[in-house]
């Protein structure tokens, strides 16, 4: 049918462009990028290549680190207020937020968490604390996705209740 009516076929995604996401989800970073290279990147992603001019600029790196840290503080405040969860803003934050599905690799990330847990138990401690955040949902009838969620919840309980490990991994 495409050969007959190519204009009737166009790709749709259930996502959002990274530029729109950046503009609304990380306003401080978006504002800084605009300060550095202007706002053309919002309509033409190739304009982001202009950022390469700043790759060795220590002042730019410092400002990016400041924005990142302020975002961590905002996440910390949100999690405390809305979920009662304490976040160490100096930890490495590893997030995976998407619908649970076998092909979306949440179980691979869970295996990584198990690996880190076993390393810590064996005495190999990370240089910085690691905070892992999973988010998502799964259809009630999708058994494997529900099993992945169950695995992650069990890992969370195991790690958070192990004082030897939870100093380094949450």
What is each of the regions a protein language model found here?
Residues 1-170:
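Catalytic cores of carbohydrate-active enzymes across secretory and cytosolic contexts
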